[in-house]
Amino acid sequence: GVENAYGFVTSIVDNGATKTINTEEEVFETKSIIIATGANHRKLGVPGEEEYGARGVSYCAVCDGAFFRDQDILVVGGGDSAVEEAIFLTRFGKTVTIMHRRDELRAQKIIQERAFANDKIKFIWDSVLEEIKGDERKIESVRYKNVKTGEVTEANFGGLFIYVGLDAVSEF
């Protein structure tokens, strides 16, 4: 049978036929391991990201999209999650702009086609976010840089959704 165990794993040792799992409280010996660590949203690490968390910066369109009704929304990322969430956010936003550091999206073609066909979605290509600005209560604008030309631009957005990947919650 399967035995579920929960805890903070400090190390795993492969003994060949068995594995030793050391946690903060117990040691387990087993033949197989299923690791379900969960994940945290990857952050950009730009000025303003922490300060404006829950005040315009979000990592969950389903959770926070309605707060930005009739505003211009920026989505950073180019993969499936970023593009799918941008499409979802068109239900609320006046416009939704996808900013991607490359000149093409990485999302699946069918998802890209839906985004390109949506009149509410705009694109900023070859660009990276450099700073999030606001009035201490909410974000008002972002500064971004075109990675090919070096041109720096500031643009107004009421909401910012960041989808640049996930990091597994593991330190072993």
What are the residue ranges of the model-derived segments?
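FAD-binding core/adjacent interface of flavoenzyme oxidoreductases
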Residues: 2-71, 148-150, 161-163
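A Rossmann-like FAD-binding core segment of flavoenzymes
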Residues: 4-22, 27-28, 91-172
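A short alpha-helix capping/helix-coil boundary motif
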Residues: 65, 89-92
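Glycine-rich Rossmann-fold phosphate-binding loop(s) that bind the pyrophosphate
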Residues: 77-79
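N-terminal Rossmann-fold NAD(P) dinucleotide-binding loop
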Residues: 82-83
